[in-house]
Design a protein with these regions (language model features):
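C-terminal alpha-helical "lid" subdomain
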Residues: 78, 162-280
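Walker A/P-loop NTP-binding motif of AAA+ ATPase domains
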Residues: 1-205
């Protein structure tokens, strides 16, 4: 389910194989930094690595840790204590790591965030045979230098190329359109055991060449955004009343999502300009 460039896939496979065998060989785990734009597969890759390697898996979100203030210290110590007592080993994934692991010389770092960073530094100061730390961020330049010194492997998750986007389109079109999987539904305990399955969508006049052309047109979109394009195609098909996706509807969704991407980038540029004006 993780579509990556061949070189990145090969490197991740090597690291996953090493992580799976590290305890057997009696060697320490290698801590990792995953960086790149949002939606490029950092979290999914970490989860897949944990499953493949047989490690237990824990997730911390920097956006959740930072507001805890001084309570973050207690929570972090609890996570590391559990990691060091696990019989299987633990992959500790820290998403949005820059939210509380940013450089200590930054002016707006609170005492609570500094304390949380100090816990991370003290608990990761030496090589570990108990846990592997995987940090994920969109802003690696904001991370504390001492924390970066703990990292053994740095992997850049870039936006997908044309070949990867085409593979994603085919993967997601199968998942959401032509062959949707069944799933258990259990909202608040109701309807447990009932199988829910989306109706398959008929592709009307959409060829392999059309999908390849769309992959080219979707340049600059992340994997998450490509998935959302296909979900929008699903909505268009069901909205037609007959669960059919025509070539015109397919192309209209692609065109609309490209325009939406341009609008979002414009919003970011306006926000950056406003922030720069306020700080000057």
């Amino acid at each position: 389910n993780v579509v990556l460039a061949p070189t990145m896939e090969s490197r991740l496979n090597t690291l996953a194989n090493f992580t799976a065998s590290a305890r057997r060989h009696g060697v320490p785990y290698r801590h990792m930094l995953f960086y790149g734009p949002p939606g490029t597969g950092k979290t999914l890759a970490a989860r897949q690595m944990a499953r493949y390697s047989g490690l237990e898996y824990a997730v911390l979100s920097g956006g959740d840790v930072a507001p805890l203030g001084n309570d973050a210290v207690t929570q972090l110590h609890s996570v590391f204590d559990w990691s060091e007592s696990s019989s299987k080993g633990v992959l500790l994934f820290v998403d949005e790591a820059d939210a509380f692991l940013r450089r200590r010389d930054t002016a707006n770092v609170s005492e609570g965030v500094r304390a949380a960073l100090n816990v991370m530094l003290s608990r990761t100061g030496g090589a570990s045979k108990d846990f592997v730390l995987v940090l994920a961020t969109n802003r690696p330049e904001d991370l504390d230098e001492a924390l970066l010194d703990r990292v053994d492997e740095v992997l850049e998750f870039d936006l997908p190329g044309t070949a990867e986007r085409e593979e994603m389109l085919r993967l997601f079109m199968k998942r959401y359109l032509t062959d949707p999987p069944s799933s258990s539904v259990g909202i608040s305990g109701y309807f447990k055991g009932i199988k829910a399955q989306s109706d398959p969508v008929e592709l009307d006049g959409i060829s392999d060449g059309d999908i390849a052309e769309a992959a080219v047109d979707l340049n600059g979109l992340s994997g998450r955004e490509v998935e959302k394009v296909v979900i929008a195609m699903q909505a268009a098909a069901y909205g037609s009343g007959d669960a059919k996706l025509t070539l015109d509807a397919f192309r209209n969704v692609v065109k609309t999502k490209i325009q939406e991407k341009s609008s979002k980038l414009a919003f970011v540029d306006i926000g950056d300009a406003a922030g720069a004006a306020l700080s000057s």
